[in-house]
């Protein structure tokens, strides 16, 4: 779960579900208590910053997984939807994230903390940075970008 403070361009990563080998049904069971009864959104106090945020229970998923999205909806998570998908969108999302301050509590979200701290551009055999971003060890980074999809692709907002 992420929140975004537009005024300060700050992303708060508030909690995570990070488990390997889960079925879509098991994932839905983990997510449901976090969004139950929250279809219109509510406000809450961030445990990280102490700031009040508007929370929306939209669930953005990898657009390459339409069957998984359908499964989540079949399990009662009607707010599951595909994130924006077009050529270059992964690079654009990461660029958008790079231009914001990101606050991560390593105790509440250890996997997100690990990934964000360790993620970097690919290197060649001599250790020189390449322009490409590796598509590995970035599951929580992807999840954060999916969660903020509506903001990232909002008209008039740039990376």
Task: Label the model's feature ranges.
Residues 7-135, 152-155:
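Mg2+-dependent endonuclease catalytic cores in nucleic-acid-processing enzymes, primarily RNase H-like
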Residues 134-159:
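Charge-patterned, long linear interaction tracts outside catalytic cores
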Residues 1-5:
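Gly/Thr-rich phosphate-binding beta-strand-loop-beta motif of the actin/hexokinase/Hsp70
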